[in-house]
Amino acid sequence: HYMHSDQWRYEGDFSEYAPIPPKTKWAKGHAADLEAAAVHQGWMPFFPQFKDNPIDLVRQAQDSGAKTDGEITQWAVKQLKDKKMQFSVEDPDAQENWPRIWIIWRGNAIQSSAKGHEFFLRHYLGTHDNIVAEEHAKGKTKTVKFTEPAPRGKMDLVVDLNFRMDSSALYSDIVLPAAFWYEKNDLNTTDLHSFVHPLSEAVPPVWESKTDWEIFKAFAKKTSELSSFAFPKPVKDLVTAPLKHDTPDELAQPKPLNWHAGECEPVPGKTMPHLQVVERDYANLYNKFISFGPKVREDGLSGHGIKIPVKEQYDELLKNPVGGTPDSRHMRCVEWDGKKYPSIEDTLDGANLLLQLAPESNGEVA
């Protein structure tokens, strides 16, 4: 948000704010350039990813002779190295790089949790604001392009899931009435202890409100229904992922060299973000939303460098019947395209599945 809300435009060189050692490598220049370097080196994610549509980039790679997913990523690496392909962070104010849809969920971003609220009003929404700061970044950035004039109103659509008419809802194009805490089934826990707090629905959601799960499920269903107009068949997408904490990725850069500056070679997953080709089957997006896929059976669950095999638990889940109504005491499966999957169609299905696979609640997994 620092880049897209154009807050970087109102900041100058580091030397304007504090004394800087003469031979320092990092504490110099402009914050926007350091953020661009962090994206180039795989230290942080940034969306949109590229100035070109990643689905179109895959097609370009295939037209250039790339046949396998590995060849597609190799093509992309060469394009990036030759500066024929550009990360969006390098030119955040180009229209191709604007974020267009903002879905606000479980927070009051506008006028509350968004740091630099007035900049969001001006550059995200294009509405009235009370900014008194002047732009200082012109001529101060080397990697990030400074475009004039600064764009106002980047967002085409703002959607808010909310049970309050707070400031985010007031500024949104669409407000989707969400269920209150006591109108949904949920699981609460934290990373500080292993206690699990199940919350049961006291009353159903009132009027037109829905639970978060049902709202996102409706998104998936409508996307599947409309997919035939744009994506009648599965398409391949080029996806970046940052280097991850508590994984071998942490050993990838003993020296933080920047390939974009010519200090080293671009190597996905080592000196730059991971690059992966992912197949998007939008026609089956809803089916996949309500199903717990089979990949976890082979790969297991992982986090913080620890892998937990759950093959036995997955096979046990497949023994449950297909169909029926959601029940906190029984589990279900769904079936589509001739295959059977553990169901996560309802929040009760999802909660039961989590309790079945979590080591905190299933001693066999622990």
Where is each model-derived feature located?
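Domain-level signature for respiratory redox metalloenzymes
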Residues: 1-160, 165-366
